[in-house]
Amino acid sequence: REPPSSSVVQWGHEDIRTGDIEAAIKAAEILTEEFTEPTFMAVGFSSPHLPWHFPKRFFDLYPLADIKTPEQPFYDLYDVPEAGKTLAELFSAGAWEGYHEKIVEAGKWKEALQAYMAGISKVDDDLGRVLDALYNGPNAANTIVVLWSDHGLHLGEKEHWKKHALWE
């Protein structure tokens, strides 16, 4: 069985100009100008949120042969309270229901991990474009950079994909 792809996890090599790169290019362009008064700039990136479509060079950073999937001991969920299991089950319904089993049976787990890591490297590259423009521009000496993110994604740990779980 192939894992669902239309509504859940999609990945592949695609060299398109996403909103992330557009944001990075625009921010880098603005940072070449000298600010004459206090200025606030927020630059948001979507990656590595789904879908995971990135240029091939980011996938190539993570050869499938080098990727290790998380261990799945039979007792892996024993330490999770019932409320945690229930929450994870509720958020794994619908299109995500049975996703872990499907992706493992289809032999696609390493590919999904590779795609997620490619997304992290892609956003790192986009952020690097912005920071390079800042540090090479006229505003580097009087600028504070603050970075934050919202959450990570479970990638098969405890047989769970997505977020919404009461474990790390």
Where are these regions (language model features)?
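Active-site loops and adjacent core secondary-structure elements that bind or stabilize anionic groups
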Residues: A27
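Active-site-proximal cap/lid insertion segments
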Residues: R1-I21, I30-E168
